[in-house]
Amino acid sequence: MKTTTLFLAVCFCLVALGCRQDKIDTKAELEKLMQVSRDWSAAASKPDLQKILDYWEDDAVVISAGEPDKKGKEAIKQMVEGSLNNPNFKISWEPISGEISQSGDMGYLLENSKITVSDSSGTEQIMNFKRVTIWKKQKDGSWKNIVDVMSPTTLK
């Protein structure tokens, strides 16, 4: 009887410990995600198509006001190639705030984004955007963007 009771107690403890999920430090994860976004912004200022694309998940969606949605990496690739082929195009952004899910596998960021385009005379037109990015944590611990939404801060 004592052996059975001891065996059941040990089994219960093992099951309880196995079901316990470590608490995610969402603040630390948010800081990591914000740094990933900053790194992505820096990558977007260089003509390295693959490095820029690596931040998106294969089935990501990009939504920009007044433009058709870009669904999937091939459509996003065409958009990025168009930007990289324009020497007068520059984009940058800075994350402002965000949140990480309690499970630590999803997050979103609110960001300020700026696109600068120079015309043939060299005059720069600056467009400011509010941006929402939704991220999914990968099995290897990296973050990939799954939804990217930009909206102009002012309407014409």
Where do the model's predicted regions map?
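Bacterial Sec-dependent N-terminal signal peptides
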Residues: 1-27
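Alpha-helix boundary/capping residues
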Residues: 11-13, 59, 83
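A beta-strand edge to alpha-helix "cap/lid" segment located at domain peripheries
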Residues: 19-54, 61-156
